[in-house]
């Protein structure tokens, strides 16, 4: 099983505690995602002007990009309360009914990992989203009866990293759909500088930029790296973070300038050295790395593919010339035609 990686985009308990102190409260402080910010500002102002609950919002994108943070910002801008839960926590229809009936008019209900709602719970959610009503079964057996409960107008914000797993009926009930994109190094630099100021960390612009460029386009990773570099600077550099200190800390953490850690590099090196650059089937690769297939597909591969170091083909995984150069190796001459073309899956 893979241990927690410093560059993992999934949240940890430390991340949750630290993020609460640096989380922006207003859209003006929410850095990056400019198209999303501009659209949400219009939707929020329009809903407030009409005195209505804002339409339901679906936010999707890779983990660590600020979906939960954006939900807090939306509730703050609307001037209403936010109730936070997640799909796996809502096990029964009664759990959802309890949440919905305790909402005040125009409140925001945030459901993280909404793709993990059970079908039974989803059925209760449909009329709640459309008509602000829920049907509850009272009693058992022949004496059971259904009663309708009216709900106050509310805004549901659903967040997911797996939008493709949402059922069509649920997806169609969201009037506003927003996709969060990876951040540019410049945007992440601004985020690191802002976080450092809030946390009282002495960090130069060059030091912040060095942290940002290795953060894989993800604010959660940038803030986590900032905390680890702060630890290094506190012991080795009197608490001051500049470019050399940031670079030395990253070398200690084994995070290279591309944002890769040892597991990323090991995967690329394995494909090059053991499988002649590929293509190699994912099961063979997982066995060679002593990792689970799911870890490769969901944790390691996405960023390597996004950055152009790895490609998926019908015949398996292949590294690109960019990967050879990153490993300090000479790329092979152009492969024979047909390599990487659709063919045998095994």
Swiss-Prot record:
Q: What is known of its domains?
A: Has 3 domains, the large (RuvB-L) and small ATPase (RuvB-S) domains and the C-terminal head (RuvB-H) domain. The head domain binds DNA, while the ATPase domains jointly bind ATP, ADP or are empty depending on the state of the subunit in the translocation cycle. During a single DNA translocation step the structure of each domain remains the same, but their relative positions change.
**Which Gene Ontology terms describe the biological processes this protein takes part in?**
DNA recombination; DNA repair
**Protein name as annotated:** Holliday junction branch migration complex subunit RuvB
Q: What does this protein do?
A: The RuvA-RuvB-RuvC complex processes Holliday junction (HJ) DNA during genetic recombination and DNA repair, while the RuvA-RuvB complex plays an important role in the rescue of blocked DNA replication forks via replication fork reversal (RFR). RuvA specifically binds to HJ cruciform DNA, conferring on it an open structure. The RuvB hexamer acts as an ATP-dependent pump, pulling dsDNA into and through the RuvAB complex. RuvB forms 2 homohexamers on either side of HJ DNA bound by 1 or 2 RuvA tetramers; 4 subunits per hexamer contact DNA at a time.
Task: State where Mg(2+) binds.
Answer: 68
Quote the catalytic activity from the record. Answer: ATP + H2O = ADP + phosphate + H(+)
Species lineage: Bacteria, Pseudomonadati, Pseudomonadota, Gammaproteobacteria, Lysobacterales
Q: Where is this region: Head domain (RuvB-H)?
A: 257-346
Q: Which residues bind ATP?
A: 22-23, 64, 67-69, 130-132, 173, 183, 220
The protein's Enzyme Commission number:
3.6.4.-
Swiss-Prot/TrEMBL keywords: ATP-binding, Cytoplasm, DNA damage, DNA recombination, DNA repair, DNA-binding, Hydrolase, Nucleotide-binding
- What is the native source organism of this protein? Xanthomonas axonopodis pv. citri (strain 306)
């Amino acid at each position: 099983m893979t241990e927690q990686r410093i560059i993992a985009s999934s949240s940890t308990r430390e991340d949750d505690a630290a993020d609460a102190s640096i989380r922006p409260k207003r859209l003006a402080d929410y850095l990056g995602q400019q198209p999303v910010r501009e659209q949400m500002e219009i939707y929020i102002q329009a809903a407030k002007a009409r005195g209505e609950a804002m339409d339901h919002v679906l936010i999707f994108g890779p983990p660590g990009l600020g979906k939960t943070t954006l939900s807090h910002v939306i509730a703050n801008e609307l001037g209403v309360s936010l109730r936070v839960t997640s799909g796996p926590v809502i096990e029964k229809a009664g759990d959802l009914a309890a949440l919905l009936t305790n909402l005040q008019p125009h409140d925001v209900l945030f459901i993280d990992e909404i793709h993990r709602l059970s079908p039974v719970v989803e059925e209760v959610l449909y009329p709640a989203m459309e008509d602000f009503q829920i049907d509850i079964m009272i009693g058992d057996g022949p004496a059971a009866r259904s009663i309708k409960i009216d709900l106050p107008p509310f805004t549901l914000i659903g967040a997911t990293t797996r939008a493709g797993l949402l059922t069509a009926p649920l997806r169609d009930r969201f009037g506003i759909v927003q996709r969060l994109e990876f951040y540019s190094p410049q945007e992440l630099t601004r985020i690191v500088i802002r976080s450092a100021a809030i946390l009282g960390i002495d960090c130069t612009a060059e030091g912040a930029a060095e942290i940002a460029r290795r953060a894989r386009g993800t604010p959660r990773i940038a803030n986590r790296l900032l905390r680890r570099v702060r630890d290094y600077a506190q012991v080795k550099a009197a608490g001051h973070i500049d470019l050399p200190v940031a670079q030395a800390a990253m070398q200690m953490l084994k995070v290279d300038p591309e944002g890769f850690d040892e597991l990323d590099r090991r995967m690329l090196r394995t494909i090059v050295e053991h499988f002649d650059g590929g293509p190699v089937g994912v099961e063979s690769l997982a066995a060679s790395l002593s990792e689970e297939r799911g870890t490769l597909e969901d944790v390691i591969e996405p960023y390597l593919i996004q950055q152009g170091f790895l490609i998926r083909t019908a015949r398996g995984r292949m590294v690109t010339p960019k990967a050879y150069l990153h490993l300090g190796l000479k790329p092979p001459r152009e492969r024979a035609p047909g390599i990487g073309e659709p063919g045998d899956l095994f």
